[in-house]
């Protein structure tokens, strides 16, 4: 599911403190929104925010120092610079921007203010640089409009990698998470994980506000991990890099290969995520196994595949006629 709506007043309120901007014109329609088709078609937030450009409609148009000079009558050449200025400013209406932002501490031209009032286009002004405004708004909109879903499991920071522990209820995911926390790793979310596709190649996991810092362990109840283990034991968000799926031993023997030639992946929001399957059985140290799986994944991300190296070594020995034993 991908949200397609945000209003001008919501955008203004979200960054009133950070960007210290003022709402100069276009107060009549604070509910003015982004074009939903443009939001659905956007490949990234860069398609929704940028410097003033007559080729790209339906996006937040940022007017910096150079753009203000372009819209001033003194910059217009010809017999009637005022008429040319009016023409340049009027073209902005055809872009149907949800919001117009004048940055770099510039004073918006009077004709631009009047045009925004007539066309009911919200006009914000800020002392911050145009580049900074673009960075802030792109980051905000990339999260707001991101494809999203929720998954059941425990999401953790293990050795700097975002790892989602999944499996059927009762296998001990939360207990495993608690043991990993005691070994120095960090908790992002327990039970419910909100996942957002924040870019073409990245999925970010966060904890619902209601469950933040909490871990439920059967027989003990709710634990406040931040209060018990300290600030370093929790994380606000992580990029999802690995799924560790816990199964019963009989399920592993029946449904999965012991040494899969091809690595396993699971589709999350249209993006393949590496997956490792670990059997839960008496006497197995799951925390050590998960750490080993994470370390192996780090090697694979660096281009080192132990299993493929072993297969190649085996082929080389067969070709040489030496058993290697």
UniProtKB/Swiss-Prot annotation:
<protein>
    <recommendedName>
        <fullName>HPr kinase/phosphorylase</fullName>
        <ecNumber>2.7.11.-</ecNumber>
        <ecNumber>2.7.4.-</ecNumber>
    </recommendedName>
</protein>
<feature type="active site" description="Proton acceptor; for phosphorylation activity. Proton donor; for dephosphorylation activity">
    <location>
        <position position="191"/>
    </location>
</feature>
<keyword id="KW-0723">Serine/threonine-protein kinase</keyword>
<feature type="region of interest" description="Important for the catalytic mechanism of both phosphorylation and dephosphorylation">
    <location>
        <begin position="215"/>
        <end position="224"/>
    </location>
</feature>
<dbReference type="InterPro" id="IPR011126">
    <property type="entry name" value="Hpr_kin/Pase_Hpr_N"/>
</dbReference>
<dbReference type="Pfam" id="PF07475">
    <property type="entry name" value="Hpr_kinase_C"/>
</dbReference>
<feature type="region of interest" description="Important for the catalytic mechanism of dephosphorylation">
    <location>
        <begin position="279"/>
        <end position="284"/>
    </location>
</feature>
<comment type="subunit">
    <text>Homohexamer.</text>
</comment>
<feature type="binding site">
    <location>
        <position position="174"/>
    </location>
    <ligand>
        <name>Mg(2+)</name>
    </ligand>
</feature>
<dbReference type="InterPro" id="IPR027417">
    <property type="entry name" value="P-loop_NTPase"/>
</dbReference>
<dbReference type="GO" id="GO:0005524">
    <property type="term" value="F:ATP binding"/>
</dbReference>
<feature type="binding site">
    <location>
        <position position="216"/>
    </location>
    <ligand>
        <name>Mg(2+)</name>
    </ligand>
</feature>
<dbReference type="InterPro" id="IPR011104">
    <property type="entry name" value="Hpr_kin/Pase_C"/>
</dbReference>
<feature type="active site">
    <location>
        <position position="173"/>
    </location>
</feature>
<keyword id="KW-0479">Metal-binding</keyword>
<feature type="active site">
    <location>
        <position position="152"/>
    </location>
</feature>
<dbReference type="InterPro" id="IPR028979">
    <property type="entry name" value="Ser_kin/Pase_Hpr-like_N_sf"/>
</dbReference>
<comment type="similarity">
    <text>Belongs to the HPrK/P family.</text>
</comment>
<dbReference type="GO" id="GO:0000287">
    <property type="term" value="F:magnesium ion binding"/>
</dbReference>
<dbReference type="GO" id="GO:0000155">
    <property type="term" value="F:phosphorelay sensor kinase activity"/>
</dbReference>
<keyword id="KW-0511">Multifunctional enzyme</keyword>
<dbReference type="GO" id="GO:0004712">
    <property type="term" value="F:protein serine/threonine/tyrosine kinase activity"/>
</dbReference>
<feature type="active site">
    <location>
        <position position="258"/>
    </location>
</feature>
<keyword id="KW-0547">Nucleotide-binding</keyword>
<dbReference type="Pfam" id="PF02603">
    <property type="entry name" value="Hpr_kinase_N"/>
</dbReference>
<dbReference type="InterPro" id="IPR003755">
    <property type="entry name" value="HPr(Ser)_kin/Pase"/>
</dbReference>
<keyword id="KW-0418">Kinase</keyword>
<dbReference type="GO" id="GO:0006109">
    <property type="term" value="P:regulation of carbohydrate metabolic process"/>
</dbReference>
<comment type="function">
    <text>Catalyzes the ATP- as well as the pyrophosphate-dependent phosphorylation of a specific serine residue in HPr, a phosphocarrier protein of the phosphoenolpyruvate-dependent sugar phosphotransferase system (PTS). HprK/P also catalyzes the pyrophosphate-producing, inorganic phosphate-dependent dephosphorylation (phosphorolysis) of seryl-phosphorylated HPr (P-Ser-HPr).</text>
</comment>
<keyword id="KW-0460">Magnesium</keyword>
<dbReference type="GO" id="GO:0004674">
    <property type="term" value="F:protein serine/threonine kinase activity"/>
</dbReference>
<feature type="binding site">
    <location>
        <begin position="167"/>
        <end position="174"/>
    </location>
    <ligand>
        <name>ATP</name>
    </ligand>
</feature>
<keyword id="KW-0808">Transferase</keyword>
<keyword id="KW-0067">ATP-binding</keyword>
